[in-house]
């Protein structure tokens, strides 16, 4: 078990080793069990997570807010359009300011060829850990949830298990590239045979 997570960012799928990902999944299953049994698990009591969204979200926002509440903390939803970012607040300033206000900063910034750069710039300036709720390159938390589901359905030994990813969500290939890319990066570490199905125009 790998337990050196305190204060670390999770921006790219490969930021954590395979062993660390397995530890995260073990903790997730334990928390899922405790919630199902009604056992107390307020591990984040009095902690506040900033959730900065540049793009809309259904599942990611809902799951992060629910997760923080279930762990005894609070998730502060922040729409970028309601901030001073459009008036000049830089990524560095956001990192410095939010890093002082909050215990963690989660960001969704999917602008093509900029989102990941922005999140990393915030991380460099922040004293609080940064979580990637999706950028133009990675969608690490959705990928972890997908791996949990596959293991629950197919067992822990995923070697040579075939995982087929359909990549046809949007008219532009750039918008959803983070989802299949994260799945390919992470699931192959577990030995999966990942197949990417896509229209011929998506090259």
Predicted regions and their residues:
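Phosphate/diphosphate ligand-binding glycine-rich loop within oxidoreductases
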Residues: 42-152
